[in-house]
Each structure stands twice: as C-alpha cells, then as structure tokens.
Amino acid sequence: MNAIRELLSFGSVVVVATCLTSIAVQAQKSSGSSALSGTSWQLVKFQGPDERIFSPDDKSKYTITFGSNGRVTIRVDCNRGSSTWKATAKGELQFGSWSRTTAKCGARSLHDQVVTEGAAVRNFVIKDGHLFLSGMAAGGYYELEPVASGKR
C-alpha cells in the first residue's frame, strides 16, 4: 500500500514538472526570446536588389525596437508602425500584420524603399555589433546599428 502511494506521489510530481516545463517553454517562445529581444536599432544603410546603396540623412528617423513581449515598433521617417515578431535560433524572422501611419514623407525620404522591401524581410544575423536583415525575394539587405541608450 505504501509503495502504491509513493508511486502515485512520484507520478504526480512528474506530471506537474512536465506541465510547468511546457508552460515555461511556451512563454519563452511567445515573448520573442532571442538575441533581438529588448533591443533597438537604427538604419545605417539599405542595399537594394540592384546593389544601389541608400543611407538615411538622419539614422534616428529609421528605427526598429524588438520588445521582449513579442511586439515590435518601427519609425520609418515620418511614419510609425507596430506588429508582432518571432525569431528562431537559426536566424529566421517573422512579423505579423503591421499597423502603421501613412503620412506623406519628404522628397529625400527612404520611406518607400524601406516599407516596400522591409515587408519581405525573413532573416537576420548580428555581426560585429550590427544587425543585418535580409531574405527579400529580390535580394538586398538592411544594416542597422544599436540605438544609443536613451534615444529610443
């Protein structure tokens, strides 16, 4: 009888531990836990599929912040947007549907290039402290640097 109680007690502990582990793993996945989690970046340059390079006149007008809660916010010149994000250890990056403002930006704006190509980003890598976003079908990539503390 004691052996049965001990076996049942042990079985209950295993079930509870398994459930808690599963909950912790799901929470980690949904919070966007990765090297990007809790980071903010500003655009250094965009190289288009035709290998032309575009650099912003003001890096602080082109920023992206990956929240640790699975949300992402962007500033693309005179517009702002938000979505959800997920990343894998293999460097795959996925965004949900974007909601954003649609103001008409100035003549020297990179808004149209960033919005058009940015929607197709599928991969990321952090190299030498810079974030590189790529994976667009037509080619090209974004290079971003960390936003200095206090400038988000």
Functional labels for PLM-detected ranges:
Residues 14-15:
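Repetitive helical segments and hydrophobic/amphipathic motifs
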